[in-house]
């Protein structure tokens, strides 16, 4: 599997932002040999970066696959997802701070994003998987739980395969400021599943947390 390289460093190009990151990569068929080769390539790529996951597109490979590794050898978890597609998302959302290898500035200054609390993912190699945040677990030792981290990372990496970056997931109410809404003004908001609701602006934040946006 050919990688994008940086001749100056004789290694993988860091902070890759290839043309593939802005386009959705379709599903393709893989032989067992091709799948194994791609998995090893992604493992090698992530080994050289201080990240928790990496998509094939970040390495300049136009294939729908990603590799995730979070935690230590004993209690951690790693996943290789082949042709992953998110088939279901919860209406509820939660806020998180994310950085991305392809956007260097966000490594030191993460962006505040909004993610779905629960997702279902269909893959060619592992079948259907479910990921859901664990708010109670997040309170233990003031650390983010394994369940919550995996829910975020999986969404992050699949986004890359759909041509989406964390800049597209930023939690912001900037649009409301531009329109100068009054607290009691009525606005129309759309849910992640397309449902439209009319609410007063003062209630908008409750809906933002569920993944709604103003239309």
Q: Regions from the language model: what does each represent?
A:
Residues 1-188, 192-198, 202-215:
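Positively charged
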């Amino acid at each position: 599997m050919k990688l994008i390289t940086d001749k100056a460093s004789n290694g993988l190009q860091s902070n890759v932002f290839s043309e593939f990151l802005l386009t959705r990569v379709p599903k393709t068929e893989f032989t067992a040999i091709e799948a194994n080769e791609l998995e090893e390539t992604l493992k090698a790529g992530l080994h050289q970066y201080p990240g928790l996951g990496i998509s094939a597109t970040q390495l300049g490979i136009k294939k729908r696959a990603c590799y995730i590794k979070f935690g230590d050898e004993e209690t951690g978890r790693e996943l290789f997802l082949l042709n992953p597609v998110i088939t279901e998302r919860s209406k509820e959302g939660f806020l998180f701070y994310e950085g991305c290898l392809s956007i260097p500035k966000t490594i030191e200054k993460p962006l505040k994003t909004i993610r779905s609390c629960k997702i279902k993912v269909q893959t060619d190699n592992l079948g259907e998987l479910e990921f859901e945040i664990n708010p109670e677990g997040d309170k233990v030792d003031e650390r983010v739980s394994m369940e919550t981290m995996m829910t975020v990372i999986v969404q992050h990496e699949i986004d890359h395969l759909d041509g989406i970056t964390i800049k597209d997931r930023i939690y912001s109410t900037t649009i409301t400021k531009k329109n100068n809404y009054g607290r009691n003004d009525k606005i129309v908001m759309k849910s992640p599943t397309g449902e439209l609701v009319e609410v007063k602006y003062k209630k908008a934040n409750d809906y933002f947390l569920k993944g709604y946006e103003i239309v």
